[in-house]
């Protein structure tokens, strides 16, 4: 079964109410449906998932290719890693990936989305998804001398995405051999075309030209210096990707909340930005944060990578302890608390 079929199932389920989702996920699904209806027109020159040919003459479909790669990569922690199992994408992840990577310009074939803003609660496979995207941009995007950075303000955070990406490669010798990937202590490289994938603390140097910048837990950033430097450095790339992925936070005057506010305006149609992909999981304003429904709505991997027992017990603790409430709301329900 194709990954696009899984994505379509998810869109259908969200829009007909069978899948619990907040208004922003409904808006993202509706946006995809609207775009599919108007694709390839003068006002909207993008087409979804056409057959393409890479530099090596191989035919591929962009929406499937990203998912196929990630499905070949192994889990890096928990029960699935212990069983040496590969990643199995859920339909919400298929929607996320196929939409982000499947749209291309009808004339140039270049990717439509240059930026993604995603808010996903903790333990929903956020870093794993980011690591998989990093691998694709590093080894399969056809970018000569690709520069992929897992960027953060602290070393610990920069490694949150790079560590699983490095482990995936270490445990996939056939993949590394076929792509010529060298796995070093603190970076990965493809010698043949000069591509590299590495963690980055603070801003890249002046000579950096990122083809992909992954910014994990953006809510922790006090300023926009890192992201702005990344964006400036991307100017020389044909189809760069700035991938921002975060839980909610408490700094409502910081750059992440401003980006969120802008992304919501794109989802509601107040602003038009055809190159920004936004996916904001969470609960709606009138939802009861102490309900199981709230947990199911905010956590797309509820019962999969994030156990229902775990979430219900965290919720119970937060309900009984006022000083634990904010952490629970931001990390597990994506509620911003100022």
What are these regions (language model features)?
Residues 2-338:
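Phosphate/NTP-binding elements of NTP-utilizing enzymes
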């Amino acid at each position: 079964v194709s990954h696009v079929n899984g994505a379509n199932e998810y869109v259908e389920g969200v829009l007909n109410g069978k899948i619990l989702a907040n208004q922003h996920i409904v808006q993202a699904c509706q946006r995809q449906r609207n775009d599919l209806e108007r694709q390839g027109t003068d006002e909207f020159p993008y087409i979804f998932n056409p057959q393409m040919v890479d530099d090596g003459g191989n035919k591929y479909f962009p929406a499937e290719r990203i998912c196929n790669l990630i499905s070949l990569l192994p889990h890096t922690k928990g029960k699935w890693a212990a069983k040496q199992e590969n990643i199995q994408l859920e339909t919400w992840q298929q929607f996320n990936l196929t939409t982000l990577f499947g749209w291309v310009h009808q004339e140039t074939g270049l990717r439509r989305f240059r930026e993604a803003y995603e808010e996903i609660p903790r333990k929903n496979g956020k870093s794993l998804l980011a690591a998989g995207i990093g691998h694709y941009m590093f080894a399969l995007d056809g970018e000569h001398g690709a520069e992929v950075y897992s960027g953060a303000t602290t070393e610990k955070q920069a490694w949150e995405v790079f560590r699983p990406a490095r482990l995936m490669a270490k445990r996939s010798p056939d993949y590394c051999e076929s792509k010529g990937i060298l796995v070093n202590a603190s970076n990965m490289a493809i010698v043949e075309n000069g591509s590299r994938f590495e963690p980055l603390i603070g801003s890249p140097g002046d000579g950096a030209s990122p083809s992909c910048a992954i910014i994990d837990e953006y809510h922790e950033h006090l300023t926009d210096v890192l992201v702005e430097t990344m964006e400036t450095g991307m100017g020389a790339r044909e189809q760069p990707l700035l991938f921002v992925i975060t839980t909610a936070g408490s700094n409502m005057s910081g750059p992440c909340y401003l980006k969120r506010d802008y992304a919501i305006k794109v989802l509601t149609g107040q602003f038009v930005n055809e190159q920004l992909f936004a996916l904001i999981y969470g609960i709606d304003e009138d939802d009861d944060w102490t309900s199981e429904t709230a947990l199911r709505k905010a956590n797309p991997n509820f019962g999969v990578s994030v156990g229902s027992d775990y979430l219900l017990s965290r919720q119970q603790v937060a309900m009984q302890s006022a000083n634990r409430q904010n952490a629970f709301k931001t990390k597990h329900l994506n509620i911003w608390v100022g």
